[in-house]
Amino acid sequence: MDTVIFDLDGTLLDTLEDLTDSVNYAMEQFGFPVHTIAEIRTFVGNGAPKLLERSIPQGVENPAYEAVLAAFKAHYAEHCEDKTRPYEGVTEMLAELKGQGYHLAIVSNKFDGAVKKLCKKYFGEFISVSIGESAEVKRKPAPDTVYRALRELGCDGSRAVYVGDSEVDIQTAKNASLPCISVTWGFRSEEKLRSEGAPENRLIRTPQALAPLLARLRTEE
């Protein structure tokens, strides 16, 4: 095992406040009710279109849906770095893995421009491949972004592992035939991850726990 594919939001970066602010900006522009951070936490994971579908009354059936989505994207593109920060220990974790020779990539359902912007700002010295949502590739849980990341890295999927914080990530890894490591510090509770099939020996509660788990998995190959 020499390759680690990471989810972004809720795994490497705490983006929840900026996402909430941009959703609520879009809601206010069109006179719709705003949402709490706790509500937005349950809405995220499937990309901006689904996030706004869950946020706006009547979802995609609302005549204003496309305009609200566009307002969200425009606001978030300008404000995605306002309050977003790496989770404590994540930068050190990536430095450790890079130093051990792992190939690292990010795949996300966040729109591609924001993914690349955030990756470059926070993790550019560790991660060279970052792929987000675009018209060119199916979003997670389809395995397409994972396959693209592996191609861009020049790595074999049989030697890769996927790391994420949600049920979408568990399903993505399954669809890509990769083992999945689930983190408990993100947008889903440990109970939720367990209910979605995350095994105890593939759950980690701190970033510092990833390198030892990867080392153990390598011995099992």
Language-model segments: what does each one mean?
Residues 23, 90-120:
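Substrate-recognition element of Asp-dependent hydrolases with the DxDx(T/V) motif
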Residues 1-2, 38, 98, 112, ...:
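Asp-based, Mg2+/Mn2+-dependent phosphohydrolase catalytic module
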Residues 53-92, 100:
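Metal-dependent phosphoesterase signature
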Residues 1-42:
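Active-site neighborhood of HAD-like aspartate-dependent phosphohydrolases
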Residues 6-8, 72, 146:
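Conserved hydrophobic/aromatic "anchor" residues
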Residues 33, 103, 179:
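Residue-level detector of anion-binding/catalytic polar loops
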Residues 5-7, 107, 163:
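Generic enzyme active-site microenvironment
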